[in-house]
Curated annotation (Swiss-Prot):
UniProt: Zn(2+) binding residues: 9, 12, 28, 32
InterPro entries, A to Z: DNA_gyrase_inhibitor_YacG, Znf_NHR/GATA
Protein name per the record: DNA gyrase inhibitor YacG
Domain of life: Bacteria
Gene3D superfamilies recorded: Erythroid Transcription Factor GATA-1, subunit A
PANTHER family the record matches: DNA GYRASE INHIBITOR YACG
Keywords, in A-Z order: Metal-binding, Zinc
GO molecular function: DNA topoisomerase type II (double strand cut, ATP-hydrolyzing) inhibitor activity; zinc ion binding
Protein's organism: Pseudomonas putida (strain W619)
Region (Disordered): 45-66
Function text: Inhibits all the catalytic activities of DNA gyrase by preventing its interaction with DNA. Acts by binding directly to the C-terminal domain of GyrB, which probably disrupts DNA binding by the gyrase.
Cofactor: Zn(2+)
GO biological process, one term: regulation of DNA-templated transcription
Pfam (any one): YacG
């Protein structure tokens, strides 16, 4: 039998076994999962991209305000 895949928890760095039985993967616990969610909600994490490209992408979908 092969060794189980182990990854580091993105929040605290603890080793986490990557297994379907682990409901929190890639996190080690519900607490670390919620800390990460809070960081996204507080905009501490962002996906790289320019604001201009987003504006161009959606500007035709909206009717002008009067």
């Amino acid at each position: 039998m092969s060794q189980p895949l182990t990854v580091d928890c993105p929040t605290c760095g603890a080793p986490v076994e990557w297994d379907a039985k682990n409901a929190f993967r890639p996190f080690c616990s519900d607490r670390c999962k919620l800390i990460d969610l809070g960081a996204w909600a507080a905009e501490e994490h962002k996906i790289a991209g320019s604001q201009e490209s987003e504006d161009e992408l959606y500007s035709g979908d909206l009717e002008p305000r009067h």
